[in-house]
């Protein structure tokens, strides 16, 4: 995310999303009753051409809308923001409806009553854009699953079968193994930065040796880590281990996975954790909350309540973290009521 301009006296911040993660962040920043301004395409009627019976001509105009609906479309790399027009050229009626299609590198200005979590998310998005993409390959002798770890969740890029089998002879297995390695390497060729190979056994080490011999340009990017499982279970191990933070710098999804893992440990010990709205409020009243954990969904539904709780937590020296429900750890927090807290001391 690029923060282009801040106009505090008007509560306006002008930004430019640079990737899909940024659009996702904006989908949680922009909400109903905010004003959003951007250059967009709008179909306008050509009043001078009475003979034409079509729907008019599309042209690029600068519009402002009062937001009514926000929808994030991962599959088409787009954020759609709909509402009534509040600013437009003279020939476009104020109060008519329009949808802004916001894509990467679309500049928009957002006018709203900025909350702490909005500004925190905006700064996180700005920092996230400076880090390389996180690519993880979880593999064994039979299959490789390749993932990119985004701020809002995990996307599976490919699942590649090796073709190695006990039913074929050793020569055929050797050929199948190298085809397997090369298919993995081809999938990874478009990515810059470090690539994490992980899994049980020696497959990760074997492909590292092959790459070191045949693809020296790629060899320097590889990091090896062991897991007990393959597939998404193996990826979950990686996210909770902290290895991604050590390689790439602090990644949002890894950070969230680790903090929810710590929460669940404390809940199992029945000590330094509380969950559910009433229990967390009680912990806040005792100034016991070290870290307040809230899902993005809970925040959307309870903004005024959350704002009051965040202020109380920060006044007592605590902090808050908003957790995405787009990944497993966020869904675990959602199952606990969408709100929990790590505590400084136990509260009865």
From Swiss-Prot:
Domain of life according to the entry: Archaea
GO biological process, one term: ribosome disassembly
Compartments (UniProt record): Cytoplasm
Keyword Nuclease attached: yes
GO molecular function: endonuclease activity; metal ion binding
Cofactor: a divalent metal cation
Pfam families, per database record: eRF1_1, eRF1_3
Family membership: Belongs to the eukaryotic release factor 1 family. Pelota subfamily.
Domain notes: The N-terminal domain has the RNA-binding Sm fold. It harbors the endoribonuclease activity.
HAMAP family (alphabetical): PelO (MF_01853)
Name recorded for this polypeptide: Protein pelota homolog
Species per Swiss-Prot/TrEMBL record: Methanococcus vannielii (strain ATCC 35089 / DSM 1224 / JCM 13029 / OCM 148 / SB)
Gene that encodes it: pelA
